[in-house]
Amino acid sequence: SYNQIVFGTVKEAWNMGAIAVGATIYFGSEQSRRQIVEVSQAFEYAHELGMATILWCYLRNSGFKKDGTDYHAAADLTGQANHIGVTIKADIVKQKLPSNNGGFKAIGFGKTNERMYTELTTDHPIDLCRYQVANGYMGRVGLINSGGESHGESDLHDAVVTAVVNKRAGGMGLISGRKAFQKPMKDGVQLLNTIQDVYLDSSITIA
């Protein structure tokens, strides 16, 4: 059911010395409306205390799969989730890297315009990710992409590709937990250091 619940308070986090709070909203799930309201209220209070806010903006609904295509990581649908996330005052948004586009048209999720697909983006991975960035007030709210699950030997390559796409699209980072922490210490550290190298490399610029 993806029924995320609040199991602590912002004030408790503040009292323990935390400088930020995070939450997850599963947009499209049965509980998403409640999650949006609760997270919005929590983030409002966090900002009153001077804390930063991070939101995991994930899509969860069986209706997002149609005719054999999974639109849970579509650029337009994830972009809309990002927009709602920043509207309720997330300072950083975490989102899956787009794998396709056209979710609005395929499932009739809401109103859209054909120019979104013909003029605002292309099928290039960087352009699809850039559309996610644009939905965060044109990049003023940072986009961090997910590293995804571990696939073994290809993890280092996959992490570098995701980091390069995110950085060149105007994103601000990559979270790569499972790819790093499900490995021996040496391999996990190497993967994280390689991701850092991408963001520290001045020759990798916004496309």
Which sequence ranges carry the predicted segments?
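Short beta->alpha junction loops/turns
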Residues: 28, 180-181
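Alpha/beta enzyme core
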Residues: 1-144, 156-172, 197-200
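C-terminal helical cap(s) of enzyme catalytic domains, especially alpha/beta-barrels
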Residues: 169-170, 181-207
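Short Gly/Pro-enriched loop/turn and capping motifs at secondary-structure junctions
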Residues: 100, 148-153, 181-182
